[in-house]
UniProtKB/Swiss-Prot annotation:
Its main location: cytoplasm. It comes from Aliivibrio fischeri (strain MJ11). It catalyses: (R)-4'-phosphopantetheine + ATP + H(+) = 3'-dephospho-CoA + diphosphate. Substrate binds at T10, K42, L74, R88. It holds the Pfam family CTP_transf_like. InterPro entries: Cyt_trans-like, PPAT, Rossmann-like_a/b/a_fold. This is Phosphopantetheine adenylyltransferase. ATP binds at T10, F11, H18, G89, L90, R91, E99, H124, G125, F126, L127, S128, S129, T130. CDD domains: PPAT. One of its GO terms (molecular function) is ATP binding. Pathway: Cofactor biosynthesis; coenzyme A biosynthesis; CoA from (R)-pantothenate: step 4/5. The gene is coaD.
């Protein structure tokens, strides 16, 4: 039986922390579906298409990873993608508290959906999309935190 997992997020932008989780999940499972969330109420730096493109570039070396956009319920994406495992990253206890609430809700909506939590290596434990965006907006260098293609896209966006 093929094990397909979903790794959802906004990925605005995708960071080395996200890429680490994707790579590790790709080593553990047959196929990783990266679900890029779109919510009209959430203001993002990049459009859904731009975020998906950055993820495709950042994961091009992984042949068992696909990138899809979605809006609506994550459990609907899991059903559509025939995945019954959700992969989430945990950096802090605040992440854990937030994710625990979501996991409980997902179980109510889709009892067969299991959640696997992966913790980042020390060098990515502090990293978030918000930190990367804010650093770039204020003129800081972000190259060490994101894929080169992503860094270029961020620098271009900040110039606008």
């Amino acid at each position: 039986m093929t094990k397909r997992v979903i790794y959802p997020g906004t990925f605005d932008p995708v960071t080395h922390g996200h890429s680490d989780i994707i790579s590790r999940a790709a080593n553990m499972f047959d196929h990783v579906v990266v679900g890029v969330a779109f919510s009209p109420s959430k203001k993002t730096m990049f459009s859904l298409e731009e975020r998906m493109d950055m993820l495709v570039q950042a994961t091009a070396h992984l042949n068992n990873v696909s990138v899809v956009g979605f809006s609506g319920l994550l459990v609907d994406l899991a059903k559509d993608q025939q995945a019954n495992i959700l992969v989430r990253g945990l950096r802090t206890t605040m992440d854990f508290e937030y994710e625990l609430g979501l996991t409980t809700m997902y179980k109510k909506l889709m009892p067969e959906l299991e959640t696997i939590f992966l913790t980042p290596p020390e060098e990515h434990g502090f990293l978030s999309s918000t930190i990367v965006r804010e650093t770039a907006i204020h003129g800081g260098k972000i190259d060490q935190f994101v894929h080169p293609y992503v860094a270029s896209a961020i620098y271009q966006k900040v110039k606008q």
